[in-house]
Amino acid sequence: MYQQMIFVNLAVSDVAASKKFFTELGYTINPQFSSDDCASVVISDTIVAMMLSKEHYAKFTQKEIADATKTSEALICLSAESREKVDELVDKAVAAGGTAGKTQDYGTMYGRAFDDLDGHSWEIMWMDPSEVQG
């Protein structure tokens, strides 16, 4: 069965630093789709974050590239299998140079956020499986 994929493309100041940051979070880099101008960060079988140098990113848009440290361009939210996994990933991000964001605890839903090296906002959320199945 076909599984649709998502490729999140983000402009970054330093591709090598982004590669290091995301590998420290436990993700892998797909060398087939990576270069000096781009890092293909494999989040899962169906989610890939493409970290593009600003020069390379500019080839795909006529719009001004947002400075994610000053404006919000998107909120990228990833699921986690447990509250502990939420904390683990965000703690790794902060240890790797990211900035901790807001924590949200609603009992059956728990999340924390971080900004990566370029200010892109990532939210990591866990939801109680019994609540999701309804």
Regions found by a protein language model. Give the residues of each.
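Mid-chain, well-packed structural core segment of small domains
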Residues: K70, A74-D91, G97-G98
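Short beta-strand/turn micro-motifs at beta-sheet edges
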Residues: T61-A66
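Core segments of cupin and vicinal oxygen chelate
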Residues: N9-Y57
